Amino acid sequence: MAFTLTNKNVIFVAGLGGIGLDTSKELVKRDLKNLVILDRIENPAAIAELKAINPKVTVTFYPYDVTVPIAETTKLLKTIFAKLTTVDVLINGAGILDDYQIERTIAVNYTGLVNTTTAILDFWDKRKGGPGGIICNIGSVTGFNAIYQVPVYSGTKAAVVNFTSSLAKLAPITGVTAYTVNPGITRTTLVHKFNSWLDVEPQVAEKLLAHPIQSSLACAENFVKAIELNENGAIWKLDLGTLEAIKWSKHWDSGI
């Protein structure tokens, strides 16, 4: 169902990152009411740039590390909801690419996303009298087919796709819809230099970047298009400047 971002309130976790910042720039062009950015490190220059792009949009920043206990996330969300009353969209975008850091990769890329999602359900779940909401989770094309030299990173992204697809199926119960946007290799600092698991391929970044990649702006433009298309359960591939809905094959069914 098509969705207009005009006058909406959006929370963007990691909205100042490589793809995140360019996506934030595209979002403010859509005349949001509020863009609330949650990120680990404040970037006043980037916040000022976002405000300058569209002064009609209120842009606010809160420091947030997705690896904090879920109670801290809930406390922060209470502050945000008290200020805005309603939130329409949550974008979960935190991610690291470093297979030396196994525990942190899982904590940031998957556990943090699950916890942030779980926390906002306290405010959105229609079983608790909530209004529902929209969750946009950033996965990766490696969630479809791994970069096998970084199996930890790729595994977390596969988990994001599976978790989000489950959320989408739960929408009739919770009132919360969900979909993933899954970028291909994108020109950001994330991929300039990173470590493979157990150092199985020391040149993994260089080899990857030898192939065609997309700009973060091209990715951001399609990212916002996916938000506007607002298809519950969609698995979007954002690769080489294109936006494509992935058809997921079913190989097993729980039957429940």
Swiss-Prot record:
It comes from the Eukaryota. One of its GO terms (cellular component) is cytosol. It catalyses: a primary alcohol + NAD(+) = an aldehyde + NADH + H(+); a secondary alcohol + NAD(+) = a ketone + NADH + H(+). The keyword Hydrolase does not apply. PROSITE patterns: ADH_SHORT. The keyword NAD applies. CDD domains: ADH_SDR_c_like. The active site is at residue 153. NAD(+) binds at residues 12-35. Keywords: NAD, Oxidoreductase. GO terms for molecular function: alcohol dehydrogenase (NAD+) activity. Its EC number is 1.1.1.1. Substrate binds at residue 140. Belongs to the short-chain dehydrogenases/reductases (SDR) family. Homodimer. This is Alcohol dehydrogenase.
